[in-house]
Amino acid sequence: MAGALENARKEIKRLSLDDTNESQYGQIYSVSGPVVIAENMIGCAMYELVKVGHDNLVGEVIRINGDKATIQVYEETAGVTVGDPVLRTGKPLSVELGPGLMETIYDGIQRPLKAIKDESQSIYIPRGIDVPALSRTVQYDFTPGQLKVGDHITGGDIFGSIYENSLLDDHKILLPPRARGTITSIAEAGSYNVEEPVLEVEFDGKKHKYSMMHTWPVRVPRPVAEKLTADHPLLTGQRVLDSLFPCVQGGTTCIPGAFGCGKTVISQSLSKFSNSDVIIYVGCFTKGTQVMMADGADKSIESIEVGDKVMGKDGMPREVVGLPRGYDDMYKVRQLSSTRRNAKSEGLMDFTVSADHKLILKTKQDVKIATRKIGGNTYTGVTFYVLEKTKTGIELVKAKTKVFGHHIHGQNGAEEKAATFAAGIDSKEYIDWIIEARDYVQVDEIVKTSTTQMINPVHFESGKLGNWLHEHKQNKSLAPQLGYLLGTWAGIGNVKSSAFTMNSKDDVKLATRIMNYSSKLGMTCSSTESGELNVAENEEEFFNNLGAEKDEAGDFTFDEFTDAMDELTINVHGAAASKKNNLLWNALKSLGFRAKSTDIVKSIPQHIAVDDIVVRESLIAGLVDAAGNVETKSNGSIEAVVRTSFRHVARGLVKIAHSLGIESSINIKDTHIDAAGVRQEFACIVNLTGAPLAGVLSKCALARNQTPVVKFTRDPVLFNFDLIKSAKENYYGITLAEETDHQFLLSNMALVHNCGERGNEMAEVLMEFPELFTEISGRKEPIMKRTTLVANTSNMPVAAREASIYTGITLAEYFRDQGKNVSMIADSSSRWAEALREISGRLGEMPADQGFPAYLGAKLASFYERAGKATALGSPDRVGSVSIVAAVSPAGGDFSDPVTTSTLGITQVFWGLDKKLAQRKHFPSINTSVSYSKYTNVLNKYYDSNYPEFPQLRDKIREILSNAEELEQVVQLVGKSALSDSDKITLDVATLIKEDFLQQNGYSSYDAFCPIWKTFDMMRAFISYYDEAQKAIANGAQWSKLAESTSDVKHAVSSAKFFEPSRGQKEGEKEFGDLLTTISERFAEASE
């Protein structure tokens, strides 16, 4: 009966499959960790992609038996139950191939980790999340190829290209391998995302549209036109590998070694320095934002290039090493007044940033003690700010309150405890923190009221005004005096001449200062009352006209009241009252104080903000004397107020004030009729406050404005701000060198954080990898620009690790089809084999050695056979290669491990790592006695045409090392003195080779990367030293004496590694040629 019911149930289900939607579903029959068996799966195919359970977990069919299918699930299966639906997709597990692969970090099934983090706001990958591998929002500039409408096109043909980054500037757009037809339309040059159709072809009367991306099943090798024999070395920059155990572009390499032997170091070296075009390894601002460069000039962020230097907060340059670009939500930073109600500085501090831009913030600690009633009880509470991490891993400042109940401690006790707790809070005045713009919305409003950004003072001094004086045959040291005159002119100068008009009787000392400084600069002055006179006469007669008396010190005393002082105009001329060669007028015109567009506009140019500090202070002092007044507030602080009718003068003044660390703001008064019916003209009122203002006022001429010089520090000026989300735009960022503080100044002196840094969603290794750099054509570039990382996070199930190796090799084949030389680094294939073992165990398959499946060797071979050099499908002709470098981590460094032995049977190069060498800090820790390469003969053609002696030198070095190993065993028995001189030379030269040739310092500029030409020249030097020594011994010399007399030669050979490759091959060949000559000559002299 039970059997009949079961058959009936199956029949009912079978009949219901007539519904097309229902036919897509099966049901879970059993669950065992990542292995799920589903029933009612008739029609599914091997390696078909399925969605398991109500969470749509990604899985892949790996076995079919009747209507049951065994599925390996790539996500955690907790909570999945029998009877849950299984959705068939009808497609194999595939990856997306197209623009956007570079600089991206994926998990084992090509899910972008950063995009998942942004969507889920979690450092973990939520179950069932579905994020496209390639961004659908980023726009790429598509350039069509030579194909046009009507041309026939077939799989692999290139029909366009895009600029991805500065290292991959010709990402070719390919037609998928299985597509073909006649072109009916092709997109014009322009910006498109990866989904928009850019090509339409017709075949057999059917039209198909293609975008810049396509998909490809990971377990199927991409087809090629022809497999070629690899004949070019894969240069790693490591001497021991490039000389003794070379690999080819398109070869297979195995790196077995125990933990701590340096497998990852070699992997990073490959990524940084290898001659591959692409490596597959398993914040920013809106356009137009002005950045302050290291020389004080402003430059649009989109115009900045790698290698440029921007201004750091300490006035020192910061080198640009990367240029992140993208398309994202943007946020406008808008300055507010201290009350946070309205814009404060006329948009001077406004700028726009991308969502992942890091804001550098300061929150003023505000500890308050108050008594309050909560739920009928009285408490004494302490309110304060604290920096803490949220559940999603974001660090932000929060307002906290700690309460002490009166009903528990009594009133006095609660108040005492509150006071003690308040005293124990961190006493720093400000909390410094950094947060991404997109996360600022999570900050509480109460915290925002106390949170500010920083306007950093400019410590750099360009000396531009002094240099300008020098060019005009004046003393550089007079730059502050000229600065004062320029500031005074900006306040009360005539817009059409170098004349100053003073309206107050109090401005006599200002007039004196103008005449005095003009005299020092070789100019003369005249006034409206006294005609053109030289400076000394002018000053004397000027005061005589006032009825002044002169004392012995040369100072004047006169009656305060005089009608003559209602208005005084001083004209400044060139030497001898000439209208030509007027230094002040030339300065006003050429330095930008008079706007070029019209004669009636004054301005203070931007470059003054980076001039010498004394020049900046003198210029503001002149402006305060001319058009300002100084007030002492009730709290004892001093404020200077400057009034001007020129907007550009006000903006320039604020910028210079900010550059000195002086707080400033602009209050705009539009033209209006006041309460008394008087017309008031347009005016900009600039308020200046802060301790550094004392440096300015000490340079004023008028007594009412002067203050004594006091000690002060130039701290950043804080400004309140609001963050407003705006539309998506293209963003432009810059990445600064790793050793810097990652902070630089915008043109408005806002202190900002560089872009391109990775978040905390990766493991430590993945944090380090994006921060590595390589040098390309003299430019320092992040290696992520030519790298795609396929990473398996620690919390990903075992099945995803099994798939990751196929994901990586498929991405590598895609770039090979573009004509690139690709290195795929599998680190480590042992983890992949362990994943294979676990799944095999759950499937109940017969285990082989150490529990690994019997088909381990076949699986490894099917992976490695996808390496090689090949002619790609399609036109134009392209030759590319995929090199596989697999790190293996055998337990305890045992090379008889099944994974190691299976890998060695397939790969052609074996770089064996030695734990003892690693413990001695000998890196790369390659054991030369067990390592080998089967590519040496294949590469002879390359060596013959480039370095003819290379094979002989390599064989000689290996022979010396091999003989020395045998001799070391003899020395342990009989001692070194029992050896012949010839054998002693072999031992000494072998030691020299090990310490100065095989060993490399990865942290030095001279040795981190060794080009093949330097490796070759060093090999010649070492072998020449060996040959000359053996020749001298054969002629009767004693090695002990000879070694002593030629110790300088040995030192020179040992120091050959210190030659900087950046000096170039020609210089290197000359230096090594001189070394070879020296070796021959010194041994010849010593032998005589």
Swiss-Prot record:
Keywords: ATP-binding, Autocatalytic cleavage, DNA-binding, Endonuclease, Hydrogen ion transport, Hydrolase, Intron homing, Ion transport, Membrane, Nuclease, Nucleotide-binding, Protein splicing, Translocase, Transport, Vacuole. GO terms for biological process: ATP metabolic process; intein-mediated protein splicing; intron homing; vacuolar acidification. ATP binds at residues 257-264. Its main location: membrane. It is a peripheral membrane protein. Residues 485-662 form the DOD-type homing endonuclease domain. SUPFAM superfamilies: C-terminal domain of alpha and beta subunits of F1 ATP synthase (SSF47917), Hedgehog/intein (Hint) domain (SSF51294), Homing endonucleases (SSF55608), N-terminal domain of alpha and beta subunits of F1 ATP synthase (SSF50615), P-loop containing nucleoside triphosphate hydrolases (SSF52540). This protein undergoes a protein self splicing that involves a post-translational excision of the VDE intervening region (intein) followed by peptide ligation. It holds the Pfam family Hom_end. GO terms for cellular component: fungal-type vacuole membrane; vacuolar proton-transporting V-type ATPase, V1 domain. Catalytic subunit of the V1 complex of vacuolar(H+)-ATPase (V-ATPase), a multisubunit enzyme composed of a peripheral complex (V1) that hydrolyzes ATP and a membrane integral complex (V0) that translocates protons. V-ATPase is responsible for acidifying and maintaining the pH of intracellular compartments. This is V-type proton ATPase catalytic subunit A. The gene is VMA1.
